Amino acid sequence: MQYGYFDNEKREYIIDNVALPCSWTNYLGVEDMAAFINHTAGGYLFYKTPEYHRISRFRGNGVPMDRPGFYVYIRDNEKKDYHSISWQPVAKDLSKAKYRCRHGLPYTVYESEYDGLASSQTMVIPRGENVLL
């Protein structure tokens, strides 16, 4: 089963099937601030060392998992429905929603389409900055 493909022009790995057998992770940051972020926005952020200067919760075994993570929720008040840009943590039915993850150097982009709404979220740690955008 194919889960994604390389885009040589953009230098990205594109995951278009979120039902992976295990977490596929991207490492963001090159200096003091760093993050491990997987294909469903799970992961954690740390400063210098993940064991002592973590900013988000650290799981020493099994990291990264789908939770904790970096999630953006979108809610439709009229329909009383909501979803997340990444497949987790809401995990909408894949027959009704489309999710895609693009791991690049040094960023990750999450894209979704649900109920007529297309959304995207870009995660990056700019070189020389101690911030996750």
What are these model-predicted stretches?
Residues 1-133:
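Anionic coordination/interaction segments
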